[in-house]
Amino acid sequence: MNKIRLVVASLLLGAATGFAQKPFNASGTGNPIIPGYFADPTVKKFGDTYYMYATTDGSGAGFGPAQVWTSKDFVNWTLMPMNWPDSHWIWAPDVMKHTDGNYYYFYCQPCMIHCGVSETPRGPWKNILGESEAVLVPDRFVTNAITLDGQTFVDDDGSVYLYWGTWGIYKGFGCGAGKLASDMKSFTETRLIPNTEATDFFEAPFVMKRKGIYYFMYSSGSCHDHTYRVQYATSDKPMGPYTYRGCILETNTDGTIHGPGHHSVLKEGNEYYMVYHRHDNPHSNRGFHRQLCVDRMEFAEDGSIKPLIPTHDGIGALASSVVKSKNLALGAKVRASSFYDADFRPEYAVDDNNGTLWRPRGMGQEWIEMDLGVARQIQTIWTQFEYGTQFYQYLIETSVDGKHWSVFADKRNNRMAGSPMVDFGKVKARYVRLTFTGGQKNGFGGAVWNLKIFEGVEASAPQQWLGLTAADWNGREWQNNEGMLGGAFTLKEGSARIQRIGGRDALVLEPGTTLEYSHPLLSSSKEHTVSGLVYRSGKWQSYEAGSCLSSGAITLHSSTEPLVITNFRYYNWKQEAAEKAYDAETDIVRLPVADQQKHGLVVSLSADDFVVNDTVPYLENRGVKGYFEARKLPLVVKEVKGKKAFHFEGTQVYTSSFMLPATLQDNAPYTLEAWVLNDSISENECVADFTTSHDELEKIMLVNGTEPRCGVINHYGWYEDAGYKDMKELAGKWQHIYICFDGRMEQVYINGKLVSEKDIQLLVKPSQFITLGRNAEGDWPFTGYLHSLKLWDEYLPLKE
């Protein structure tokens, strides 16, 4: 989508509606309220804290991980990881506090609802029925209600109701509803709310009560496009029957608020606020890069809901701001090593807008530099990377003159995900430079929603400041790679080593050894939690580490006996007892860093290396080391229309002796080139399957078929696959197929003609081998000729 057109349309819309609507890419917009891709929000206020539970979007089809966003002011949000759910899909979470004092967490997978329980709204959670994926509501638990999108409602008498449903548009279908028993494990009453009461009901029910009226709200249309919208019906009973009242939220005129829906409602005093998701700008393919927004609801005197006018402004703060310093980066002059295109300019990193971001052109080390105009004191820098649920590695430097640079924060070994990433220091500087150096996943690069620079110490974000495992010991330092503060424990005296003991890797401090971690923000007088695990008397025990904390330092010392320790943690907030107990028995997860050591040419096969009529049981790979071996029947080399070619007759299948390199995992850029001739092209024929996994978006499969949706390249993604509608016309002709993907856009060429170009996202997993002649599942046999095949683990645009 062209952003210039969108801005002009936004301005015209504001004039037409009589108020000054901010353009979606203006500085300081209040919507989206979260920097990242999230959907299906449930917002709750427990105590003085707002909690935002949502589907993790932008990761395929809601594949997690589990998380919650928290805020004290409804403007500055912090991402906090949760232990559960740990399932493949984590969709549409909802949390409620029961009269028993516990919190209940409902979420769904297709097509079932699960329920967890915890003593805190952050967890740790456990399935109320025992096993992690035990099902509370199976599919069609209520006849003709497809189970999805569970949402609770608590009535004035304390009764708890659950509503659920999707694809409720069919005749006789609708939304499931049930009154939960006091144990929250069963229902005392159920009913189908049919689509004759809730017109066009598709999914995402939400029920609230106001002045004796029950409002049954829901989403209609397709969540992938502009038709998604919110409608509602009313009743005088929580289970209905309901009377349809109309649509209250839909795509705006200029399309910058696109496909709004799957909402929840926050009541604050006498005000009601609708929190919903909408598609990103510019709109991503598939519609699974959604963002969270909020707007005020209004009611007419008769109790009907007035149609919402969705805004880019949002509602602002609902409490005093936790941030006390001015954002020095806002509107600063900025330059960068590169930017993807005009939709992702460097200026978008300093506009305090959660809907715009700077995206560098490449996936390697890229930088962005801010000029504050004059030298200013800097004590805190917040960085909100594109994906807060995965870790980034980076370096922040400062300079007075733009020539001589000093390190402000070195996170080049960081393995902690979070948003914002918070770095502290104390320096006077005019220039600030952020350099992305790597991270958890390939193909995501160092894109940034916002960079915020503060003169004061801004430490309000509740985070894990220290997180250390035995693997973080490098022989001289114990590096804080899983903690927000970075840095390291330094060896002051003695010696330490890594040892496997009691089923865990541990750091052993020999007698007389002292390690010290220094940071000015550490203090026993400030709210905190510090803990670890130590091995004593033949078992692992909680380490009450409070005594090791002093003003500005943590000191670990072993006296006459070794100190065997791991999982050392420090939080800048006070954990509840359940959270402490969970940490006492749970290891810190230390995820690997994505492999960025490119190989270049990974696969290279050519029939020109053989003589016509050769029988070829082995194909030497001239890319990375290795070969392809026939499983049964070997190929024969033929001469076809001026080219030597391997003749596949549907029975030949080859597998590689090597794995797909890790540099091609996740969303990594790649380039694929092949010469193929097929006399009789079937619907789906697999030339080469480069992956052994078989889940959504995990495939890189070269296909030669007539299927217009996926007949050229198949990723197991309905929107991401690509075909060619005129493929039948190429039967009996040589096809030069060239596919290149830069981590965002994939171009597909056949004989030099661009047949597909769209933004996609891949989730390629480790693959044990590459398959020729069929896919890894043994289907889609290829019956044709292959002259050559090449695969690179880098983006190489097609040259004219």
Label every PLM stretch briefly.
Residues Q21-T199, K209-G255, N270-E271, H277-S321, ...:
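Beta-rich carbohydrate-recognition and catalytic domains
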Residues G287-Q291, G439-V448, S558-N567, Q747-Y749, ...:
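Extracellular carbohydrate recognition
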Residues M297, I381, I396, L451-I453, ...:
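Extracellular beta-strand elements of beta-rich domains used
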Residues D302-I305, T311-D351, R361-G362, E386-E397, ...:
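Juxtadomain low-complexity/linker regions and immediately adjacent membrane-anchoring helices
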Residues D351-A461, N572:
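Aromatic, loop-rich ligand-recognition surfaces of beta-strand-rich domains
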Residues W465, N474-N481, T490, R500-G502, ...:
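Extracellular glycan-recognition modules
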Residues S518-H519, G711-H736:
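Short, aromatic/His-centered strand-loop micro-motif at the edge of beta-sheets
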Residues G546-L563, K758-Y785:
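Flexible glycan-contacting loops in extracellular carbohydrate-active proteins
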